[in-house]
Curated annotation (Swiss-Prot):
<feature type="topological domain" description="Extracellular">
    <location>
        <begin position="1"/>
        <end position="8"/>
    </location>
</feature>
<comment type="function">
    <text>Plays a role in cell wall integrity. Affects the cell wall polymer composition in the growing region of the cell.</text>
</comment>
<keyword id="KW-0735">Signal-anchor</keyword>
<feature type="compositionally biased region" description="Polar residues">
    <location>
        <begin position="240"/>
        <end position="249"/>
    </location>
</feature>
<protein>
    <recommendedName>
        <fullName>Suppressor of lethality of KEX2 GAS1 double null mutant protein 1</fullName>
    </recommendedName>
</protein>
<comment type="similarity">
    <text>Belongs to the SKG1 family.</text>
</comment>
<dbReference type="GO" id="GO:0033101">
    <property type="term" value="C:cellular bud membrane"/>
</dbReference>
<keyword id="KW-0961">Cell wall biogenesis/degradation</keyword>
<feature type="region of interest" description="Disordered">
    <location>
        <begin position="41"/>
        <end position="86"/>
    </location>
</feature>
<feature type="topological domain" description="Cytoplasmic">
    <location>
        <begin position="30"/>
        <end position="314"/>
    </location>
</feature>
<keyword id="KW-1133">Transmembrane helix</keyword>
<feature type="transmembrane region" description="Helical; Signal-anchor for type III membrane protein">
    <location>
        <begin position="9"/>
        <end position="29"/>
    </location>
</feature>
<feature type="compositionally biased region" description="Polar residues">
    <location>
        <begin position="48"/>
        <end position="58"/>
    </location>
</feature>
<keyword id="KW-0472">Membrane</keyword>
<keyword id="KW-0812">Transmembrane</keyword>
<feature type="compositionally biased region" description="Low complexity">
    <location>
        <begin position="136"/>
        <end position="146"/>
    </location>
</feature>
<dbReference type="GO" id="GO:0071555">
    <property type="term" value="P:cell wall organization"/>
</dbReference>
Length: 314
């Protein structure tokens, strides 16, 4: 009974674990094959300056057939000499024939080519045909051809991935002229609108001088203005101490009082914090403090605090 129970438990646990491990190994093997295949396909595209070769891009490549220097045969007979040289077209034709003969015959692959790739191939073939039909005497076409050849010599991945479609020269010139004139007129219109509508930090209009003088005279002659004794309109020297506490003195002086009026008003009622104490009594206040009153007697509070720290006598 015990052996049967162990076998059943082992089968119930071991069989699912074995199947799971087997499935994991199979998936790992297929993934490794897939990764290896992708790495082999992307070997050429990993380098930034390398050429890109896809399975459907063989028709887009332009065969570079450099002209080979063939020996020139000179036949000299008597007083006459004839030079038998081959033309450039014959050399190019011979090179293409040799390349075709040297390459082994390949079976065409049945690969799917999307519509945009077909259209791209047709546009490239049309562009190549137009370049061949151009006259070599045209300076503009010659300069363009030389630029294209230099570009092909040092092509990058970006140059190969972005196609260049054919365009009519007349249409390109007309569109460029129209765009230039349109941009010029639109820029001028925008500049004029901005000049009219833009606020260059404008300030409000200046008030008239008559209103300002009226306002100044009214403020000066007003009797409700309360100023300090050190005001510019006061003819008497200021006797107020800046270190004293604020007082409740009320100034009812005129704008420009005379010295006699100031002397007649010599007796004024000042309110200062030191008036709450008897300054002559030194036992109550050791030193005069203008900010001390009956609620904030700092000297007395300090004395009481020090006395509280001393040991008490029993």
């Amino acid at each position: 009974m015990t052996d049967g129970l162990g076998v059943s438990v082992g089968c119930a646990v071991g069989i699912p674990c074995g199947v799971a491990v087997l499935v994991a190994v199979i998936f790992w093997y297929y993934m490794q094959r897939k990764f290896k295949k992708e790495i082999e396909d992307d070997e050429e595209s990993m380098s930034g300056d390398g050429t890109i070769s896809f399975t459907n891009l063989h028709s887009m490549r332009v065969p570079d057939n450099p002209e080979k220097d063939l020996p020139v045969s000179h036949v000299v007979g008597g007083s006459t000499s004839s030079d038998n040289t081959t033309t450039a077209q014959n050399v190019a034709t011979a090179g293409q024939m040799e390349a075709q003969q040297s390459q082994p015959s390949k079976k065409p692959k049945n690969t799917y080519m999307p519509a945009y790739r077909k259209r791209l191939n047709s546009s490239l073939s049309t562009l190549q045909h137009q370049d061949e039909q151009r006259s070599p005497t045209d300076s503009s076409s010659t300069s363009l051809d030389t630029k294209n050849q230099n570009g092909r010599a040092h092509s990058t991945v970006l140059d190969q991935m972005i196609p260049v479609l054919a365009q009519d020269d007349n249409a390109a010139a007309a569109s460029s002229e129209f765009s230039l004139t349109h941009e010029r007129t639109s820029s001028n219109d925008n500049l004029i609108k901005n000049l009219h509508n833009h606020d260059f930090g404008s300030y409000p209009k200046r008030r008239s001088s008559g209103n300002l003088t009226g306002m100044i005279s009214g403020n000066v002659s007003s009797a409700s203005v309360h100023t300090r004794t050190s005001s510019v309109h006061s003819g008497k020297k200021n006797n107020e101490n800046v270190f004293d506490t604020p007082n409740s003195q009320k100034f009812h002086e005129a704008v420009a009082p005379s010295e006699e009026d100031a002397e007649s008003k010599g007796m004024r009622s000042y309110y200062m914090l030191k008036n709450n104490y008897d300054v002559e009594n030194a036992s109550q206040i050791a030193e005069e403090d203008q900010y001390e009153n009956e609620f904030t007697n700092y000297s007395e509070s300090k004395r009481e605090f020090i006395n509280s720290l001393r040991p008490k006598k029993n």
